[in-house]
């Protein structure tokens, strides 16, 4: 899909979005209540602990996803992201989690999956049924399988890369330490 000359990235995630938004809203409300209440407010250690909880909600419920780029699959997990070129993928499936195999190695994406019930429904419908009868997971599987075929037999596909989520890792470390220090000092 092209949009004004730029390839559109298709991003998919499982059902943690609503829980994540509710969790983040709860963190913001509790922080606001703690800031506006005078003497009966929260303990000093509760502030960094709440922000730590917010970062955990973000990292566990909102960050994980999979994305289909033009030439590669992005598996975004809690603390790292893998970029897998479509031409290198030897096997791909979406069960409870997304599983990608490349040269005998398995890479798992926790951001998108299907329930057993959905997997069984997709199997009963069959591959020749109209696309509106299948789940989103089945449709994503088919999109990836179509892209797995090498586009250019001459060009060497890129390597599988991992990028750490340094912002989340740093925030978790600093906030855990701040919570511990304020708990011990206060």
State each model region's role.
Residues 1-39, 142-186:
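N-terminal membrane-targeting/pre-transmembrane regions
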Residues 43-45, 60, 66, 110:
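Short leucine-rich amphipathic alpha-helices used at interfaces
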């Amino acid at each position: 899909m092209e949009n004004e000359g730029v390839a559109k990235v298709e991003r998919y995630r499982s059902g943690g979005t609503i829980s994540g938004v509710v969790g983040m809203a709860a963190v913001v409300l509790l922080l606001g209540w703690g800031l506006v209440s005078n003497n009966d407010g929260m303990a000093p250690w509760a502030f960094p602990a709440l922000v730590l909880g917010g970062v955990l909600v973000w990292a566990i419920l909102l960050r994980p996803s999979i994305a289909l780029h033009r030439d590669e699959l992005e598996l975004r997990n809690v603390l790292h992201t893998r970029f897998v070129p479509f031409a290198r993928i030897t096997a791909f499936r979406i069960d409870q989690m997304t599983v990608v195999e490349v040269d005998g190695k398995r890479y798992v994406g926790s951001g998108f999956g299907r329930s057993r019930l959905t997997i069984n429904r997709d199997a009963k419908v069959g591959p020749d049924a109209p696309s509106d009868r299948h789940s989103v997971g089945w449709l994503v599987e088919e999109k990836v399988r179509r892209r797995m075929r090498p586009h250019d037999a001459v060009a060497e596909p890129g390597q599988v890369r991992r990028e750490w989520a340094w912002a989340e890792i740093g925030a978790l470390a600093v906030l855990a330490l701040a919570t511990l220090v304020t708990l011990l000092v206060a």
